[in-house]
Amino acid sequence: TPSAIRDGFAALRPDAVLCSLAPRLGLTALQEKLGGFGRLARMNPNATSVVAQGYNPIALGDGLPADARAALLALLTPLGQTPEVPDALIETYAVVSAMGPTYFWFQFDALRQQAEAFGLSPADARDTLRAMLHGAVDTLFASELSPARVMDLVPVRPLADSEAAILHLLDDDSE
């Protein structure tokens, strides 16, 4: 709320760094609401940070000096990667890097359950899925094959008849 922002600003020391996690309040608007305070950053943390594999884009305000930037980025290192991005793209990164896993986690868990139902131990199911997922991502993004060629590498695709409907759901959800 505006009053909470004003109250928070009153407590800020001049040498403080404020890192906003607010999704829609850009650095310029935040600086205005904070009475011109410019030692600002805005970031998009994501859930995979809990295993130090986060991809947490950050926008650094123009008023944030180099030493404060370095200290903030060092503080965030244990979370995973923290690429500096333009403030205008934070929401886009939120959709891809923060919400992206939610498109897949339930499917990964369903595959794990199937693997166990077919006889794999929980540990073997987990290890198999982990290796398969890493390999699948690397095949799609590092093989230099087109996405169509990658998807054609496996002759049997159990969800082939549902792919168009799934893509339609993704299109509807992103609007």
Where are these regions (language model features)?
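Short alpha-helical interface patches
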Residues: S3, F9, E84-V95, Q113, ...
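NAD(P)-dependent Rossmann-like dehydrogenase/reductase catalytic/cofactor-binding core
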Residues: E116, A123-E175
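Polar/charged alpha-helical tracts
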Residues: A10-A11, A66-A70, A74, D161-A164, ...
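Rossmann-like NAD(P)(H) cofactor-binding subdomain of soluble oxidoreductases
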Residues: T1-I58, D62
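Glycine-rich beta-alpha junction loops
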Residues: P23-L25, P45-S49, S97, M132-G135, ...
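Internal alpha-helical scaffold of NAD(P)-dependent oxidoreductase catalytic cores
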Residues: A29-R39, Y55-Y93, Y103-A142
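A short, flexible low-complexity segment enriched in Lys/Arg and Gly/Pro that occurs
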Residues: L18-R24, A70-L79, E163
